[in-house]
Amino acid sequence: MFVDDVTRAFESGDFARPNLFQVEISYLGQNFTFQCKATALPAGIVEKIPVGFMNRKINVAGDRTFDDWTVTVMNDEAHDARQKFVDWQSIAAGQGNEITGGKPAEYKKSAIVRQYARDAKTVTKEIEIKGLWPTNVGELQLDWDSNNEIQTFEVTLALDYWE
């Protein structure tokens, strides 16, 4: 095996870089594309159904399911980014002593995740995530020993599917 063999295995182009991406959730505004620090492309799973016949089992395709999606967001001093998620979550299920909640058409939104080539302009992969809403707006860590770092928080979102 030679180094050239490795590079030939990627004839379609260069290696994908995990730090060249943007997340767009239009509901949260244009600034969110710069506030989302980390994420992963969500998993899609096709469950297997074991079917027995005599003493053998075969597996056939079951239903497709989608795991929750997590994003890491850089917080701003005014806490606008986090408050937008809290407000969005409150559309689904109100906060406080009132029992409120909106219809799915009111709180389910879409997102686009784009991964870029090394020129940071060419989109190499784009997926649209449908039926999103925040199930968990994560905690904000406060620590006197946290110097020279930006405060971040995680948000977990339920989703219907991605394409």
From Swiss-Prot:
GO biological process terms, alphabetically, are: symbiont genome ejection through host cell envelope, contractile tail mechanism
Cellular component, GO annotation: virus tail, tube
Q: What does this protein do?
A: Forms the central cylindrical rigid tube, which is surrounded by the outer contractile sheath assembled from gp18 subunits. The tail tube first 2 annuli are formed by gp48 and gp54, which are in continuation of the spike complex. During infection, contraction of the sheath drives the central tube through the host outer membrane, creating a channel for DNA ejection from the capsid into the host cell.
Q: What UniProt keywords apply to this chain's record, in alphabetical order?
A: Late protein, Viral contractile tail ejection system, Viral genome ejection through host cell envelope, Viral penetration into host cytoplasm, Viral tail protein, Viral tail tube protein, Virion, Virus entry into host cell
Question: How does this chain assemble?
Answer: Homohexamer. The tube is composed of gp19 hexameric rings. Interacts with gp54.
What this protein is called in its record is: Tail tube protein gp19
Q: Which organism is it from?
A: Enterobacteria phage T4 (Bacteriophage T4)
Q: Which pairs of Cys residues are joined through disulfide bonds in the record?
A: none
This entry's Gene Ontology molecular function terms read: structural molecule activity
Pfam families from the UniProt entry: Phage_T4_gp19
| Predominant place of localization | virion
Query: What subcellular locations does the record give?
Result: Virion
InterPro entries the record matches: Phage_T4_Gp19 (IPR010667)
- Return the similarity comment: Belongs to the T4-like viruses Gp19 protein family.
